[in-house]
Amino acid sequence: MIDAFARAWQRMGKPEYTEAARRAADFILTNLRKKDGALYRTWRDDKAEIAAYFEDYAFMIQGLVSTYRVTKEDRYLQAAKEQAAKAKKLFWDEKHGGYYFTDGSEQLLVRMKNAMDSAIPSGNAVMAQALLDLYEITGDAEWKQQAKRCLMPTGRQ
C-alpha cells in the first residue's frame, strides 16, 4: 500500500498521497519494528505480534524506496537499506540464491521459497525490483548483484 500511495502521487500529483505513504511507512517503522530491526507482521489492540515473513520485508522495502523517491527524505532510503540487510540475514539462501519465505528460527522440515507470482507478485520478484531500485538510486553495485542472485532460482524452474 505504501508503494501504491507513492506511485499515486507520481501520477496524480496530489500531496495527500505522499502524506499517506509517509504516515504508513512511519507507522510501521515506529510500531512494527523490533529493537534489532526485525519486523512484525500484525498490529492489534495497540500491540505488534507475529514475526514478519519474507514477503512482508520485500513489500516494505519496495514501499520505503518509493517513498524515498517522492519525498527525497534520506531516512526512508536508510530504512530501506537496513531492512534489505535484515531480510538477507534472516531469509537468504546462500547455497541456491533467492529468499526463503520464513526465517530459520522455526523447526520446519522444509523451508519454502516462492519464486513464482500468484494473486500478488512473489516476494522474490518484489525484492529483486527493490534491490535494483536501490542500485539505481545509490550506484552501489552490491544491490545489483544481490538482485541477480535473488533471481537465480527462477531460472531453474
Model-predicted regions and their roles:
Residues 2-157:
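Glycan-recognition and catalytic cores of secretory/periplasmic carbohydrate-active enzymes
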